[in-house]
Amino acid sequence: MRAILILLDGLGDRASEILNNKTPLQFAKTPNLDRLAENGMCGLMTTYKEGIPLGTEVAHFLLWGYSLEEFPGRGVIEALGEDIEIEKNAIYLRASLGFVKKDEKGFLVIDRRTKDISREEIEKLVDSLPTCVDGYKFELFYSFDVHFILKIKERNGWISDKISDSDPFYKNRYVMKVKAIRELCKSEVEYSKAKDTARALNKYLLNVYKILQNHKINRKRRKLEKMPANFLLTKWASRYKRVESFKEKWGMNAVILAESSLFKGLAKFLGMDFIKIESFEEGIDLIPELDYDFIHLHTKETDEAAHTKNPLNKVKVIEKIDKLIGNLKLREDDLLIITADHSTPSVGNLIHSGESVPILFYGKNVRVDNVKEFNEISCSNGHLRIRGEELMHLILNYTDRALLYGLRSGDRLRYYIPKDDEIDLLEG
């Protein structure tokens, strides 16, 4: 019995005047989603806590039943997705070439991503940057556009990922000083490591600015009235840690179908298979051929449409996705789940927002409720009101894999009914 989770990134939204005070999902014509809702069980899901906006990576981590304490941080997930070798005495951050202007207050970020810059220019800029500061080794791995993975290593392990971002993320803000975050440190030793790591990174970033500001590539770009790339903005410091694989935790062979290398990194971290797809349509067409217990199909299109801050763009994407979902060929005993990881408002200033998201379950074991349409408002009248941490338990339940609570099967506690070859059997 397969569980198929279709994840429409950032699907949840807010009402807007341009859509007659409806959300894009309410306004869109979605006959296929509505049919599934009418014949399934619906509700709302809060991925973490009401009102707290989440990023894609941590939202998925929670939806797959892992805790925030187990989450290593996005930097190392991104590094895994880029096939970068992961070392024990290193931390990993996302770094981006941006444009800043220095004034008496600090470095005002004009653009977090330098526009119209070639790969050749980027390589020449990066080749001029320092690789060592105060005993810490800095190494940049190109990712895409103006983005990199920054690996920082200290040979004796005197390093910590419990440090803050320099990238302010929001518009019209200044570069932030990297600081040790005391509340994340479990000991004074860890806090000391974090302070030294932050100090070295701040020194590195200032050195990088001095080099880039006067680099001949940027001097030439200024003459051509092009935006210079004069600062390296960092965020998402993280360090590798081992957690239970998805198979160990849930007893299901799993695959992720997605376009982004971020999901490749998540798959590698959790021991899931990864199939890179070029489109949501390709994923829909591929599902009938797959014999995994758990199939996760992700599309970023809904989220990207919301980021344009034009609700009509999101309506168009939702209607396109609905048509493709109508082509999905399910097996008789498949369990289908459709939901989002978070809400992405197509109006207002927020990047992501903290509202709950609609969710539907469709399959032979599901209790059908009275919901007739799939959207944020209709689903609020459905049977379900769940948190993200409960999703996988419901999937085990509706695929008849849930172990009776209190039973102890094998050498560790499980949520799922194990197969004989997964536990030691007593022999006479």
UniProtKB/Swiss-Prot annotation:
InterPro entries per UniProt: Alkaline_phosphatase_core_sf, ApgAM_prokaryotes, Metalloenzyme, Pglycerate_mutase_ApgM, Pglycerate_mutase_ApgM_sf
Pathway it works in: Carbohydrate degradation; glycolysis; pyruvate from D-glyceraldehyde 3-phosphate: step 3/5
Catalytic activity: (2R)-2-phosphoglycerate = (2R)-3-phosphoglycerate
Gene Ontology MF terms: metal ion binding; phosphoglycerate mutase activity
GO biological process: glycolytic process
Pfam families: Metalloenzyme, PhosphMutase
This enzyme's EC code(s): 5.4.2.12
Enzyme class label: isomerase
Keyword rRNA processing: no
Disulfide bonds: none
Keyword terms: Glycolysis, Isomerase
Annotated family: Belongs to the BPG-independent phosphoglycerate mutase family. A-PGAM subfamily.
HAMAP family referenced in this protein's UniProt entry, alphabetically: ApgM_A
Function per UniProt: Catalyzes the interconversion of 2-phosphoglycerate and 3-phosphoglycerate.
Protein name (database record): 2,3-bisphosphoglycerate-independent phosphoglycerate mutase 2
Organism expressing this protein natively: Methanocaldococcus jannaschii (strain ATCC 43067 / DSM 2661 / JAL-1 / JCM 10045 / NBRC 100440) (Methanococcus jannaschii)
Gene (UniProt): apgM2
